[in-house]
């Protein structure tokens, strides 16, 4: 299913500028997993910081603010994996509530396992998150499935979520992933509705799909997602597009045999975790994690 109208927000790496530098040089050092919210005449950006396996993995989630959406100052908040009692942190989800308060959803790895869970904390401002006050909102199942990287929106009076699921029953299959869709009246109690997007045999996304950003437009839904063809491409996923009229039934737009819609020009080609934030005045800013020439991952941005 081809639809060039859905390419409007695809990353163009040549137009990207650096937003957050990785915490070191070389493979395994990442700044990325962005979640952006336009507020207070600027952009709040939540992101994950990571070191290589054996050197800390996903060691912190930070939140920073920039008036221009590009030049972020020192973080207004930093949450460490030690504070969360987790082996590693992944992409956060920052949400502003209708009453002006804020929520931060955190993906947490259970030590010694492949299991992931999602916890949530709430505060009056992004600088005031206190993770001593938090709850598990998506527990997963330590023997059956890991749940992480939720993408959450409020639309038409309902909460929508697309979360990444990894199967755990077979140790050789835990790198596989699908995106499952859920709804909620409050963003806390979720009801799973089904598989929104899964890999296609023989295609560039055959090993797994992870929805990263979603846009509603009337009766249609467009999702930008990360995909990989093999376990070897873990950490170097690339970006594709899926569409549908139902948020639980998305169809990839790339033709059979075609590659991803966007990738890094460097090394493994990783270009993932795209996030879109609409700005006052009608423009949109893109944030995404992209592999650099030295193998590290930087958080970059574009303005459309």
Where are these regions (language model features)?
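Beta-rich carbohydrate-recognition and catalytic domains
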Residues: 1-87, 95-207, 215-269, 278-304
């Amino acid at each position: 299913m081809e639809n060039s109208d859905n390419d409007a927000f695809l990353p163009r790496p040549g137009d990207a500028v650096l937003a957050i530098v990785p915490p070191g040089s070389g493979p395994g050092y990442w700044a990325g997993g962005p979640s952006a919210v336009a507020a207070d005449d600027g952009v709040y950006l939540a992101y994950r910081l990571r070191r290589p396996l054996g050197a800390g993995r996903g060691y912190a989630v930070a939140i920073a603010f920039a008036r221009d959406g590009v030049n972020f100052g020192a973080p207004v908040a930093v949450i460490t994996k030690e504070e969360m009692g987790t082996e590693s942190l992944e992409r956060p989800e920052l949400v502003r509530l209708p009453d002006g308060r804020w929520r931060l959803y955190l993906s947490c790895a259970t030590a010694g396992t492949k299991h992931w869970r999602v916890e949530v904390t709430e505060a009056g401002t992004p600088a005031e998150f206190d993770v001593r006050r938090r709850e598990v909102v998506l527990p997963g199942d330590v023997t059956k499935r890991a749940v992480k990287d939720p993408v959450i929106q409020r639309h038409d009076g309902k909460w929508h979520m697309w979360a990444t699921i990894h199967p755990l029953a077979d140790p050789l299959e835990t790198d596989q992933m699908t995106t499952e869709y859920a709804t909620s009246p409050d963003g806390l109690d979720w009801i799973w509705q089904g598989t929104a997007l899964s890999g296609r045999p023989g295609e560039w996304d055959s090993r797994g799909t992870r929805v990263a950003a979603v846009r509603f437009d009337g009766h249609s839904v467009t999702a930008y997602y990360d995909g990989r063809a093999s376990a070897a491409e873990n950490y170097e996923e690339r970006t594709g597009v899926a569409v549908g009229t139902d948020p639980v039934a998305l169809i990839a737009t790339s033709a059979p045999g075609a590659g991803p819609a966007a990738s890094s020009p460097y090394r493994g080609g990783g270009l993932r975790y795209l996030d879109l934030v609409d700005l006052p005045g009608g423009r949109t800013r893109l944030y995404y994690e992209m592999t650099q020439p030295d193998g590290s991952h930087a958080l970059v941005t574009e303005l459309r």
